């Protein structure tokens, strides 16, 4: 049995923070912002977190899938910013959406790639006929130390996919590959409030090497060429890297631009590349093929070949599009952002 994406959904908080304002506050040159290709980043309201956003995205995915939540038999949640250090978010999603208690669930961790791994796992479970439908969610309120360059891009958003049989799918998962190494490019030890990053490792040895390796493996094993794909979506830590990796792979930039989200909302970690995929699915036509390659620090990358079916056009209209969320925004000041996200602790 083949598997595919039956339904997809997204959620992006309404609040936006101007990236240039952050840069000026901490003394960064305007050229730094320009070089990153970022304009604004999405940030949560005081009552939003990775769990509430996950529920929003999953509800949208259910609307598109048009299935009863009780039919879902596996729920996987990928995040770097879980509300609880020890308590799964996937169980909260199960009860809040009316999913059966007779369901496999787990929270996954692999930096920005955990949800992508979940997508591969659910695809395999469906293909092995162990489940009919599974739900995977990538949701993050991305963490960054105030004043660190990461604060220019770290953002909040969520994306969800319901995986099921190919004959019911909006898009078929044709093939997938993975590439993984031990790479110290980004980490957060237990008890640390914010992650650290080894800047010498974040570019060529980590992001570019892993994505290129996963994509080249997909092309080789699947028998594809670059020209077989209509859209390419890469992990988006900023607006510059996905364009650079496209150039290295010989991908025309016009095949990348529709999947870009980071210039408008920043990098929402687990919802980065998969949110770009959702943005493409919102507009894709039957017969078009998409290559999506998420990346997670530590480090690893997956590459998927996804073929759009004739069921997609009906489902595109059933829930808000990623573009709708991008355009529905309210710009706030850094001080409001710092207050609503508890950036600074008050000790009495």
From Swiss-Prot:
(3S)-3-hydroxy-3-methylglutaryl-CoA binds at residues 29, 112, 153, 202, 235, 267, 297. Keywords: Acyltransferase, Isoprene biosynthesis, Transferase. Coiled coil: none annotated. CoA binds at residue 240. Its EC number is 2.3.3.10. The keyword Transferase applies. It is an enzyme of class 2 (transferase). The active site is at 80 (proton donor/acceptor), 112 (acyl-thioester intermediate), 235 (proton donor/acceptor). CDD domains: init_cond_enzymes (cd00827). GO terms for molecular function: acetyl-CoA C-acetyltransferase activity; hydroxymethylglutaryl-CoA synthase activity. Pathway: Metabolic intermediate biosynthesis; (R)-mevalonate biosynthesis; (R)-mevalonate from acetyl-CoA: step 2/3. Pfam families: ACP_syn_III_C. Disulfide bonds: none annotated. It catalyses: acetoacetyl-CoA + acetyl-CoA + H2O = (3S)-3-hydroxy-3-methylglutaryl-CoA + CoA + H(+). Signal peptide: none annotated. GO terms for biological process: farnesyl diphosphate biosynthetic process, mevalonate pathway; isopentenyl diphosphate biosynthetic process, mevalonate pathway. It comes from the Archaea. Belongs to the thiolase-like superfamily. Archaeal HMG-CoA synthase family. Interacts with acetoacetyl-CoA thiolase that catalyzes the precedent step in the pathway and with a DUF35 protein. The acetoacetyl-CoA thiolase/HMG-CoA synthase complex channels the intermediate via a fused CoA-binding site, which allows for efficient coupling of the endergonic thiolase reaction with the exergonic HMGCS reaction. HAMAP family: HMG_CoA_synth_arch. Catalyzes the condensation of acetyl-CoA with acetoacetyl-CoA to form 3-hydroxy-3-methylglutaryl-CoA (HMG-CoA). Functions in the mevalonate (MVA) pathway leading to isopentenyl diphosphate (IPP), a key precursor for the biosynthesis of isoprenoid compounds that are building blocks of archaeal membrane lipids. This is Hydroxymethylglutaryl-CoA synthase. It comes from Sulfurisphaera tokodaii (strain DSM 16993 / JCM 10545 / NBRC 100140 / 7).
């Amino acid at each position: 049995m083949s598997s595919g994406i039956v339904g997809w959904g997204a959620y992006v908080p309404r609040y936006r923070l101007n990236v240039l304002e952050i840069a000026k506050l901490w003394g960064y040159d305007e050229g730094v912002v320009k070089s990153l290709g970022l304009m604004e980043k999405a940030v949560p309201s005081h009552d939003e977190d990775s769990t509430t956003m996950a529920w929003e995205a999953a509800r949208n995915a259910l609307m598109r899938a048009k299935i009863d939540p009780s039919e879902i038999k596996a729920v996987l949640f990928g995040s770097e910013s879980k509300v609880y250090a020890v308590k799964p978010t996937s169980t909260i999603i199960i009860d809040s959406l009316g999913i059966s208690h007779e369901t496999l669930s787990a929270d996954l961790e692999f930096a920005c790639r955990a949800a992508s791994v979940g997508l591969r796992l659910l695809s395999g479970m469906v293909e092995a006929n162990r489940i009919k439908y599974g739900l995977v969610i990538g949701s993050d309120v991305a963490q960054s130390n105030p004043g660190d360059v990461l604060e220019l891009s770290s953002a909040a958003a969520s994306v969800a996919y319901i995986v099921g049989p190919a004959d019911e799918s909006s898009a078929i998962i044709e093939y997938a590959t993975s590439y993984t190494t031990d790479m110290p490019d980004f980490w957060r030890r237990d008890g640390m409030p914010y992650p650290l990053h080894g800047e010498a490792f974040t570019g060529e040895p980590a992001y570019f090497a892993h994505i290129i390796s996963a994509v080249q493996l997909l092309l080789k094993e699947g028998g594809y060429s670059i020209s077989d794909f209509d859209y390419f979506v890469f992990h988006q830590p900023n607006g510059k890297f996905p364009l650079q990796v496209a150039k290295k792979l010989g991908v025309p930039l016009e095949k990348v631009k529709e999947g870009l989200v980071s210039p408008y909302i920043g990098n929402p970690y687990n919802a980065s590349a998969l949110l770009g995929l959702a943005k493409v699915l919102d507009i894709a036509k039957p017969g078009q093929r998409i290559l999506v390659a998420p990346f997670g620090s530590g480090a690893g990358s997956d590459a998927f070949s996804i073929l759009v079916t004739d069921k997609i056009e009906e489902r595109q209209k059933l829930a808000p599009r990623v573009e709708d969320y991008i355009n529905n925004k309210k710009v706030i000041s850094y001080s409001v952002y710092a207050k609503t996200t508890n950036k600074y602790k008050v000790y009495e």
